[in-house]
From Swiss-Prot:
Group of enzyme by EC: transferase
Annotated signal peptide: none
Sequence similarity: Belongs to the class I-like SAM-binding methyltransferase superfamily. MenG/UbiE family.
Enzyme Commission (EC) number: 2.1.1.163
Region Disordered, residue ranges: 1-33
Biased composition (Polar residues): 8-20
HAMAP family (UniProt xref): MenG_UbiE_methyltr
Protein's GO biological process: menaquinone biosynthetic process; methylation
Positions of S-adenosyl-L-methionine binding: T85, D106, D141, S142
Keywords assigned by UniProt, alphabetized: Menaquinone biosynthesis, Methyltransferase, S-adenosyl-L-methionine, Transferase
Protein name: Demethylmenaquinone methyltransferase
Keyword Transmembrane appears in the UniProt entry: no
Pfam family, one: Ubie_methyltran
Amino acid sequence: MSVPNVDPSHQSNASANEATRPSPAAEGLDKSGERVREMFRQIAPRYDVMNHLLSLNIDKWWRRKAVQTLKIKGDDPILDLCCGTGDLAIAIADSAGSDVQVIGSDFCHAMLEIARVKESKRTRDTAGGSGRHTIPFLEADSMALPFDDDAFQCVTVAFGLRNIADTDQGLSEMARVCKPGGQVLVLEFSQPTLPVLKQAYNFYFRHVLPRIGQWMARNDKSAYEYLPESVGKFPCGDALAGRMRDVGLQHVTFRPLTLGVATIYVGEKPGGKTDHAEMAAHREREALVAT
């Protein structure tokens, strides 16, 4: 098994890189790196509870569905970026088996500290960690990942893409570090497809959740306003699938979950064995037509 090289200069500059990047005006939110990092630093101890509130406690099932979507082959490593407190990375590691190295990256140190505690407990509880890779959780800029091109068989992100200052740059980096033929997977909140549910969910987001946030929050009330707003303004469905295609991914599909409250998007990086087989078959068909 090969473990991707990490460029320490990228890792050490993660905070500076994201802090100085401007926020795109198109989505109408201040997603500058310093603002988002500080927000997540403040809510890190309650982040898991926040996700349960946002998802009405269905987020664990969504993650299981995301893991089941991955086509894990051989022992090539897997990257989960914007990993937060580590739930998806740990779920992937539990599913992938002991031969596959899973790596988590995030730009918020406080979130990574919680992920490391979870990982330490996981390795203790599973046969003492015998024969099992420990997940390294690295502080890194998702718009300038410190990994070589074509390093991972799968690159994933759950509930984090909408928080990257430049969505397209984040997707581009995911595609860059993915191996040809590998998968890029996004699990993200989206807009419910059923009109009645959409109306109820929007009411929950705009009126119920902020009140819960005010009760839970101390100095971080803005986080409980930003997170629902970021969901409402983030592209979903065909719009996000199109942006995945724009960064060079192919065979992009998406699957709404829980009537569209969340969606799994999957794309493939061109250049894998399947592509070569398809090209060979195409050439054979052309040769037959020519004769």
